[in-house]
Amino acid sequence: MDINLFDFHLPEELIAQVPLEDRETSRLMVLDRETGDIEHKHFTDILSYLHEGDCLVLNETKVMPARLHGVKEDTGAHIEVLLLKQEEGDKWETLVKPAKRVKEGTVISFGEGKLKATCTGTADQGGRQLEFSYDGIFYEILDELGEMPLPPYIKETLEDRDRYQTVYAKEIGSAAAPTAGLHFTEELLEKLKQKGVQLAFITLHVGLGTFRPVSADTIEEHHMHAEYYHMSEETAALLNRVKQNGGRIITVGTTSTRTLETIATDHDGKLCAASGWTDIFMYPGYEFKAIDGLITNFHLPKSTLIMLVSAFANRDNVLHAYNEAVKEKYRFFSFGDAMFVASHAKMRNK
C-alpha cells in the first residue's frame, strides 16, 4: 500500500506551536467510524459522548527532560544528547549531535561536571550508547539539567514544562508525551468518574521513533520502532469487567491503543496483565480486537499514526475528516485539537 494514500495538504499555520491556556478548551471533532459523519464540538463535550459503564484507558507515562547539552571533555566542543531508553544500570540508548564527534571512549560533561557520560558503543543514524556517572539521584540531576524534547515541528520555547505532561503522568520514561491525554484536566476526569465512566491506566513509554517519518515507499516495507509497555492485573480485570457488562473501551491516544491491541494480539484476543516491547503496526486491513473507540489528536501526513486511525475508521472517512479539519482551521499535532472516533458516535450523544 502506497504511503501517499495517507497524504493531505496541511497549511503550516495550523501546526499548534504552543498549548492553549486551558487544557480542556481545545476543540473536538466527533467522527462516526462507520458512516463518516462529523460533528464539531469542544473537548468538554466528551462528557456527552461517554456514558456509565464505559471505560477510558489512559497512558500514565511521564516525559523525561531528555535533551541534554554538554561539552566534550577533551576539546570543549558542544554536544547535544537525546535520551531514548534506559538499558542496563546507567547505560542509555541515545541520539547525539553532531554524531561524528562522539566515538567510543568519548567523555561528555554536563552541568560543569555534575553529570558525565562515556560513549561505550555506536549505532546508525546518530545512535550512541552512553554510560552515565554522577553523585546523587540520576532523575533529580536530569530534572535540573535536561530540557523537554519537543517534536521537531514545534519551534516555540515551552514556558511551562507541565504543559507537556498529562495531569495523571506518573511513570517516568518517555521521550515524548502521549498527547491525546493533554486535553484532560483533573476536574474533567472527576466529572467523568461521577458520571460512572471508569478510568483504567496502562504505561507505554513513547520513543522518538514516533516522530521519524516513514521512509519506505510502501507501508509493508516500514518497520515500527519498539516501545516498552505494561498493563497491571488490576487494569486487565477492570477492562474485562467492562467488556462483560457491555461497556465500551475507549483508548486515549495511539499509545494506549497500541498497548491493548498488542496484548490482545499476543493472547488470542484476551486482555491480561502483560509487559514487554511492542512494534505493532496498525494500518488498513488490521482487525481491532480490544477497543471500541479512540480519542486522538490530528497527526502528520503519511505518518504511522494517521495510518492507525485509518485502520480504525476507514481511510476515506479519516482523510475526509482531516480535510474538514483543515477547512475549519483545527489546530494540528501535539498541542493541537482532538478527535473522538467511535461507532455510532452521534447516536450515543445524549
Swiss-Prot record:
It is found in: Cytoplasm. Its main location: cytoplasm. Disulfide bonds: none annotated. Keywords: Cytoplasm, Queuosine biosynthesis, S-adenosyl-L-methionine, Transferase. Its EC number is 2.4.99.17. SUPFAM superfamilies: QueA-like. InterPro entries: QueA, QueA_dom1, QueA_dom2, QueA_sf. It catalyses: 7-aminomethyl-7-carbaguanosine(34) in tRNA + S-adenosyl-L-methionine = epoxyqueuosine(34) in tRNA + adenine + L-methionine + 2 H(+). One of its GO terms (biological process) is tRNA wobble guanine modification. Pathway: tRNA modification; tRNA-queuosine biosynthesis. It is an enzyme of class 2 (transferase). It holds the Pfam family Queuosine_synth. It comes from the Bacteria. Belongs to the QueA family. Transfers and isomerizes the ribose moiety from AdoMet to the 7-aminomethyl group of 7-deazaguanine (preQ1-tRNA) to give epoxyqueuosine (oQ-tRNA). Monomer. This is S-adenosylmethionine:tRNA ribosyltransferase-isomerase.
